[in-house]
Amino acid sequence: MSQVYRVDITALCQYNQALLKTAIAPVSLDPPFFYHNGTTAMLYGGLGFLFARCLFFALDVVAQIADATNRNTPVADESGHLEKAVRCQQPEVDQETLYPFLPALEVAHAAYKKALNGSQDARLKGMEQYSGEQVFFLTMCHTLCEEDGRGSAWSPACNAAAREFEPFAKAFGCESGSSMNPKKKCNFF
């Protein structure tokens, strides 16, 4: 049986502001981020989502630095933290849990759909009951999986981002108003 550990995103990718470059650790080229014979959904739900998270994490750091130095930057809002830019008027939603996961999900999913260019993704052998879209979300959630200390795996960040993302509800047929498809949703873009 495999072990589940929480992954610190800062250990997987780094953004160098001086060089304007993002570096991703070689370990990211293994599951759950990258599957050598995976589908397009697995590529974008894994490595694509990781890269998008890295970029949004870096943007928030840049916004905080800009705020601290009182410079104007196109990514800084009045507080300097992009997590506040997640448009969410729901008091029960922890906006800190949504950032950078919700904007990264929005970007990775848009890239996935663009890569498909209107075609259907391949079905996974042994998991034919899942559409490519569902595999995208399953892979994304797998990258966020952590152990709760009692031996159970869970993903609060996955749940927080997925419940606010309409394509997730559509892919899994979540009933409107249910816990994974609230009528009012938060968004970044």
Model-derived regions, located:
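Zinc-dependent metallohydrolase catalytic domains
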Residues: 1-51, 55-189
